[in-house]
Each structure stands twice: as C-alpha cells, then as structure tokens.
Amino acid sequence: MRVSRYFGTDGIRGRVGQGLISADFVLRLGNALGRVLAQGRDTRPMVLIGKDTRISGYMFESALEAGLVAAGADVQLIGPMPTPAIAFLTNTLRADAGVVISASHNPHDDNGIKFFSAMGEKLDDATEAAIEAAIEAPFLTVDSEYLGKVKRTRDAIGRYIEFSKASVPRGFTLRGLKLVLDCAHGATYHIAPMLFRELGAELVTIGVDPDGLNINAGVGSTHLETLAATVRESGADLGIAFDGDGDRVLMTDAQGRTVDGDDLLYVLARAWRASGRLKGTVVGTLMSNYGLEQALGTLGIPFIRARVGDRYVHQALVESGGVLGGEASGHLLCLDRATTGDGIVSALQVLEVLRHEGLTLSQALLGLHKVPQKTVNVCWSGPARAAVEMPEVRQALVEAQAAVQGRGRVFLRPSGTEPVVRITVEADDVVLMQQTLDRLADVVRDAA
C-alpha cells in the first residue's frame, strides 16, 4: 500500500488555517492538479469545483481557482452542491477532473479537498502520487495567452435532480408518504427538498438554513436526535438524514429508531436479490455488524469485507463484480446507478423498495438481527497510526479479542480523517461488549 504524504482515505482534510488546509497550500494544490492534467495534451484541461456550505469554502474555492488557472486549466465553478453531484457533473460535462471543497460530517472549522477523475470516480493511487510530486515542484504560471478561463455553471441543480430521479423507475412516486428530511445545513439543503417534493412526498425539513457556521451542528447523519424527535412528533412515515456534503444517508423509522448503513444494505440486498437486480458480492467493511453477514448468508447472498473507507468498498465491488456495498456510517454505493456514494440516490433506492413491497421501514428489517456493537473515539495527539504499534495497546487488543472469541469481534484502527483512534467491540452479550470496550479504551487513553 502506498504511503501518502498528503492524501488520507478521503482526500485531504484538517483544521482551517492549519497545515494542509490553508489558502497557500490549496493554491499550490490547484496548481499541481492543473499541471498533472495538462501533461501530454495540447488543449487546456477543464476542472469542476464544487463545495459544501462552510464559510471557508469561499477562500479555498478562490485558491484552487487561481492555482488551476495559473497552470493553464479552465475552471467551472458549481457552487454549493453535494459531493456525488460533482462526481456526476464531472462525467456528464466532460471535465477532466472534479474537486469538492468539504470536510463531510466534520464541523465548520474543518475543511478538506476531494478529487474525482473524468469518469466521476475517486482518484487512483498513481494520480494522487503524481499530484503530490507536483506540489513539491516550483509553482507554475504559464504565459499569459495560455492562462485558463473561469465560468460559473448555471444549470447544475437541474441536471443533478434529473439524474437522481432517473435512478428510480419512471412511474415511481412518493405521494402519500410523509417524510422528515435533515440536510445538516449542508450541501443538500437546496436540492433534496426540491427533489422529494417533485416526487410527491409531504415534507418536514430541518437543517436547511446554512449560515456558513452551522453545518453538521446538532443535525445531519451524525446527530439523529432532532430527526428522530421530529419524526415522532410529526407522525411521519420515516426520517432521512444526510451529512454535510451529501454522500452519506441514515434513516429513522416511524418510531424514531436509527436505521444505519448496515440496515439499509440489508434492505437493498434482500430486495435486489429477489428482483434479480443484485449482481456479484455485497461488500461491507471490517466495521460492518456481524448480524448483517449472518442475515445475508441466510439468504444465500455472498458478503465480503473491505477496509474502512468508501474508496476501498468501491475497489472491492469492482474486483468482485458487485453493485452494492457500503458502511454503517451511511456511505452506500449503488454502482448500477452512481459512480460514488450518493446519499440522495441511495435514499431513493430504499424508498423504491419500500413502495414496491408495500412495507414500512421497520417491516423491511425484520430479517436482520444485529449483535450489540459500540464504537468509541479516543483522541490521539500524535500520528494516530502509531497507536496500533504500541506494545501495551497491542497486548490489550489481543486480550480483548480473546475475551469475545466465538461471540464477537474487536477492532482498533486510526481514523483516516480525524486525529482519533476508533475502537469497536461487538459481542452477543451487551455486558461483555461494554466491559471489553472499556478495558481496551482505558489502555489506549493511558498510552495517548
């Protein structure tokens, strides 16, 4: 596996104004991307830039734009749009690359940069390595007659809404359904309500008033409390929550109970198997609940686990010929409908199943029995990867795995996007799970 100097599991991310997430670095990053794209061609490359709603997006949009134009690349500014929309638009507008300025589910004082290839897919390792090498080279400003040009795309919202609606059958409608949408004050705030209303749903909306600072603040897929309460109070059929950049989706049923990515994978896999739509292997991650694996096995559906991160789920799907995969966090990939994780498209796939089968969300989950699972994040001041190499942590991990052997699983991994170590324990007994988790977390905290 390539060791990256700048890129994490989902692009480049950090605190605004510090390290890599500074205007001067992003200027160089844009210049590096432009130079890589220009290699071996006579025409100017074209790059799309989109962003979520955090206030620092204006600063980084300008920095990227300047770096790209200096390198001789044309730029199309999309403005606030979901990450998967930029993936789609990069492909359909025949751009050479797409860039998203977002830190996903993180608070407003974080930001990041994600890239897409001309096909609307995450960059491969070789392209990332070429960009990293170009960052280290001197800044390039081409001669004036070769500078890039910038324009703003005006019809992006309509294009993406029609793309999303095309992911379900033409006769599909949400008439008669009452939904609560939580858009996290993020990139879906203006698109998701419009789309779901066009399909006929009665809507209650929360998280649709971004001010640049409130993205993911107590709302969205990482804060489902408000969504759950609103579903219960309004008598809605279910709730749908997106994260700040719209590539994740979680739900709540009519009683306000959380329905995570593992649950949604089960709903889709079961229905698609019955309809013949499911191809190849369903892909989860090392964090996917053991109960999901058991339930799919009962249905005769093959299931494999990839490393944590939607890019690794995507890679495993391509290698296994599959079309459905995802993570408990809500990154779902429906590769027969979209090239990357798309919260809106994934939500529509689930709703299409429920409408077709005439089931409520809770009824669609009756065949899935997950084992108790819990994850804690332990802050780590230095490189989080160092945690798993410390002798006392490794010994504690061995002991934890022995404690749940035959009854569950234990995972300890550094986050690819935050300065934390994630510890997950699952076991068929909730007391055993909690005791094992507490002991291991205490050792990691002491080591930190």
Swiss-Prot record:
Coiled coil start-end: none
Positions that bind Mg(2+): S104, D243, D245, D247
Residues with Phosphoserine modification: S104
EC number(s) from the headed UniProt entry: 5.4.2.10
Catalytic activity as recorded in UniProt: alpha-D-glucosamine 1-phosphate = D-glucosamine 6-phosphate
Encoding gene, per UniProt annotation: glmM
GO MF, one annotated term: magnesium ion binding
The protein's name: Phosphoglucosamine mutase
UniProt keyword terms in alphabetical order: Isomerase, Magnesium, Metal-binding, Phosphoprotein
Species name: Xylella fastidiosa (strain Temecula1 / ATCC 700964)
Keyword Nucleus: no
